[in-house]
Amino acid sequence: MSDGIMHLLDPAPFGRVLPAMITPMKPNGDVDFDMAQTVAKQLVADGADGLVVNGTTGESPTTHMDEKVELVKAVKEVVDVPVISGAGSNDTAHTVRMVEQTQEAGADAVLVVCPYYSRPSQQGIFCHYQAVNESADKPIIVYDVPGRTGVRIALDTYVHLAELDHVKAVKDATGDIAGAVRKRMETGLTWYSGDDALYLPFLSIGAVGIISVVAHAAAKPMRELAEAFDRGDIAKAQGLANRIAPVIEAMNGTGFQAVMAKAALKVRGIMECTTMRLPNIGPNDEQIEVVRDGLRASGLIPE
């Protein structure tokens, strides 16, 4: 095995391509659990081998605990892939409650974002995850997204987090490839890209997969990209990365990603209602057309 694909020695316990799944809403704003099951099944049919529910793309700041629990149960009923539940907050006690209840509902792991807005110290970040670890009986995926949280998890903090029993993986949305190399090598944690545009670069430094918004539109070529990389067919992987670049640009460039993910499902004919809870607003006609053009340019829908 060449050095370029040594990352295969790392397990991918939660899958390779994991859509950060939207939460379908009815026109009145209620969660549409039946449609959630439809979307989950479609994403798995597309090539996803894991799903993340109740994340930011799933409008988690506006959904309530009972809805989060029911969403985990609904999705678990219809798919045979790992289902990870977002359980993050800037309130440690609330995070612990979410972890406990979504685990009880059947989540295979929890995705816990670094506490946001309050900008805690590195010691505070560690203590937050330590408290979550003490209440967890399933794996914890650390979510590092400084563009949203206002704080970056330091290398030394990662080293200490890796010593916690249930911390097993990282969703890295820092955009810092060089930093990810050191963090991954010095912690031994399983690494996932949290940035669609950096999917292939993250694979090249040892990530096992991606937690993705664009997988609502492109799970199949994203899975093929990972498989090509595994075979050492870098030219094929590069070609696939280039192919999906237009839809990545479309879904990243003109609106909140959850909005654009719902637009993509509408364009694909999977889901008609794109209602969102305030303060987010569903996609407008222009955003839908931008996504449609991106899907066409990537060869994901007919011209």
From Swiss-Prot:
What cellular component terms from Gene Ontology apply here?
Answer: cytosol
Q: What is its EC number?
A: 4.3.3.7
Question: Which reaction equations make up its catalytic activity?
Answer: L-aspartate 4-semialdehyde + pyruvate = (2S,4S)-4-hydroxy-2,3,4,5-tetrahydrodipicolinate + H2O + H(+)
Q: In which pathway does it act?
A: Amino-acid biosynthesis; L-lysine biosynthesis via DAP pathway; (S)-tetrahydrodipicolinate from L-aspartate: step 3/4
Alphabetical keyword list = Amino-acid biosynthesis, Cytoplasm, Diaminopimelate biosynthesis, Lyase, Lysine biosynthesis, Schiff base
Subcellular location per the Swiss-Prot or TrEMBL entry = Cytoplasm
Residue sites binding pyruvate per the record? T57, I211
| Short name of any one Pfam family annotated for the protein | DHDPS
Q: Name one GO molecular function term.
A: 4-hydroxy-tetrahydrodipicolinate synthase activity
EC top class, as a word: lyase
Q: Which CDD domains match?
A: DHDPS
Stored InterPro entries = Aldolase_TIM (IPR013785), DapA (IPR005263), DapA-like (IPR002220), Schiff_base-form_aldolases_AS (IPR020625), Schiff_base-form_aldolases_CS (IPR020624)
List the active site. Answer: Y143 (proton donor/acceptor), K171 (schiff-base intermediate with substrate)
Kindly list the residues the record flags as site (Part of a proton relay during catalysis). T56, Y117
Task: Provide the GO biological process annotations.
Answer: diaminopimelate biosynthetic process; lysine biosynthetic process via diaminopimelate
Q: Which domain of life is it from?
A: Bacteria
Q: Which NCBIfam families does this one have?
A: dapA
What does this protein's UniProt record list under function?
Catalyzes the condensation of (S)-aspartate-beta-semialdehyde [(S)-ASA] and pyruvate to 4-hydroxy-tetrahydrodipicolinate (HTPA).
Q: Can you state the subunit structure given in the record?
A: Homotetramer; dimer of dimers.
**What family is reported?**
Belongs to the DapA family.
What name appears for this protein in its UniProt entry?
4-hydroxy-tetrahydrodipicolinate synthase
